[in-house]
Regions:
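Membrane-proximal intracellular helices of multi-pass ion channels
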Residues: 1-322
């Protein structure tokens, strides 16, 4: 293909994917594999989501566990999690051929590059990754969400605010000895399930950013423990780092690939250092207003506002900068 035909193929494929994903979200109410009977998303949110996934933009304005059916997650989002990084890899190789082919015509075939990137790179890595994180407790099932009993009941006032010091006796809720009228006692919780592991693996490898759950890998079912956290972080850099060396090999000058990798690595270390120092020390405004605990027996301290409490500042900074 000439570069013009290659470009047209990329745009046509992406446009078709955008249309399919948009329609899946809007009409998911009428489609199968929707055990929760979730309504279709609004057209503007569907368009926003479709553009985000097709362009690999790392933007998510919805909660997948409550707003998307299993079909939309699998046939829509997971497919785009595969084909958008594959498209990026294909375009990279078209660029490499443009550098190296002096007399040859064309920059390769987009459909061949797309297929090879998906079958030989993304699918094997995703299969291995999905099996590993599923073994750590990430859901991978077609079963609908389950309702489970809480170990202890919790109470909320009429405005939906959690009553931290509430004493619960049946349906009666008291705080500091006074009965809270119209308080609601919650004894059950809905646990969202689905085939999360297969989507999370390629989400990390393809760096799309659209997770199965609304809070992505801060959700304990999407990222259960330190090992899954480490693995998912490594997935983020695996393919980008490898492509640096692929570039050097294909232009027949490995030093160029090493140079690109080292430039990326140094910028990463610089970014991690700046963010880590500032997040660990926090700011005087936060410390003065007691929003930051400098340290406790089980926590190294730092600005934990908006952070994943299970992993602390170190892992949070690493995830954010990677």
């Amino acid at each position: 293909m000439s570069w013009k035909k290659y470009l047209v193929s990329v745009l046509a494929f992406s446009g078709f994917g955008l249309l399919v994903l948009f329609l899946l979200q809007v009409f998911q109410k009428f489609l199968p594999f929707n055990p929760q009977h979730i309504e279709g998303m609004s057209w503007d949110l569907s368009l926003n989501t479709a553009i985000s996934f097709v362009t690999n933009t790392n933007w998510q304005a919805y909660s997948g566990e409550s707003q998307l059916s299993y079909l939309s997650q699998a046939l829509g989002l997971t497919v785009q999690n595969f084909v958008t990084p594959a498209t990026g890899i294909a375009v990279l190789y078209a660029l490499i051929r443009g550098f190296t082919r002096v007399k040859g015509k064309g920059v390769g075939n987009f459909w061949t590059d797309l297929t090879r990137s998906t079958l030989y790179v993304l699918m094997p890595l995703s299969l291995a990754g999905a099996l590993i994180i599923a073994s750590q407790g990430v859901p991978q099932t077609w079963k609908a969400a389950e309702t489970v009993e809480l170990m202890e009941p919790v109470a909320f006032d009429a405005d939906g605010n959690y009553l931290e010091d509430a004493r619960i006796n049946g349906d009666t809720v008291t705080v500091d000895g006074e009965v809270v009228e119209d308080a609601e006692v919650v004894t059950e919780e809905i646990v969202p399930l689905g085939f999360a592991a297969s989507q999370i693996a390629i989400k990390q490898l393809g760096t799309n950013g659209g997770g199965y759950y609304g809070v992505n890998s801060a959700h304990p079912l999407e990222n259960p423990n330190w090992f899954s956290n480490l693995l998912e972080m490594l997935f983020l850099l695996l393919i980008p780092a490898s492509l640096c060396f692929s570039f050097g090999r294909d232009v027949k000058d490995k030093k160029q690939g090493i140079a690109i990798f080292m430039a990326m690595f140094l910028m990463l270390i610089a970014a991690m250092s700046v963010v880590a120092v500032n997040e660990q020390s926090a700011s005087t405004v936060l410390t003065e207003n007691e929003y930051v605990d400098t340290s406790t027996d089980g926590q190294a301290g730092g600005n934990m506002e908006g952070k994943e409490a299970r992993f602390g500042i170190g892992s949070s900074v690493t995830w954010a900068t990677w």
